[in-house]
């Protein structure tokens, strides 16, 4: 739940870019994708967990190569291209994309073609979530959400599937 608490903190912090509207947009895009592809909510939660576990080391490597600010800029640019293949390729090599497709497919039972088709939308949603911790222009500071995600000690506090589940509960308390 640690990462979700950072999301809530970013929403409540006037110096960070996170908002309830952003969180709703991210969860809605994931829900629409799941509905259009016939993916059950529990299966989508698993998809997000696996995606986060595969993306984390790739982003950690980029952070060590490029530096934290450059990684943040790259994430911002990828979001700006919306769920497009070019935005995806700016963050991940085709080899990494293929690894993600295979890993998610193996762990969820979804077809590789379904994962490949969903990957730009899913990655855009993850990057949007990670970008919510960015400080507003003119304010110094680091992205707390991205830092928490990358500095994970693998205790489960940064599971993107859990973040999706808690976000849905937060946004739709009557649906619990």
Regions found by a protein language model. Name each.
Residues 1-176:
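A structural "flexibility-hinge" signal
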């Amino acid at each position: 739940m640690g990462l979700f608490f950072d999301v809530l903190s970013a929403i409540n912090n006037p110096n960070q870019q996170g908002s309830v509207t952003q969180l709703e947009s991210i969860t809605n895009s994931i829900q629409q994708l799941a509905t259009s592809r016939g993916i059950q909510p529990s299966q989508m939660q698993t998809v997000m967990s696996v995606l986060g576990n595969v993306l984390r080391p790739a982003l950690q490597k980029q952070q060590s190569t490029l530096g934290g600010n450059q990684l943040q800029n790259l994430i911002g640019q990828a979001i700006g291209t919306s769920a497009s293949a070019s935005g995806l390729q700016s963050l991940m090599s085709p080899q990494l994309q293929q690894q993600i497709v295979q890993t998610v497919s193996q762990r969820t039972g979804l077809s590789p073609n379904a994962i490949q088709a969903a990957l730009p939308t899913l990655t855009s949603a993850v990057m949007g979530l990670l970008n919510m911790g960015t400080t507003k222009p003119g304010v110094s500071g680091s992205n707390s959400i991205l830092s928490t995600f990358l500095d994970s000690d693998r205790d489960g506090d940064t599971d993107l599937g859990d973040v999706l589940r808690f976000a849905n509960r937060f946004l739709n308390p009557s649906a619990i």
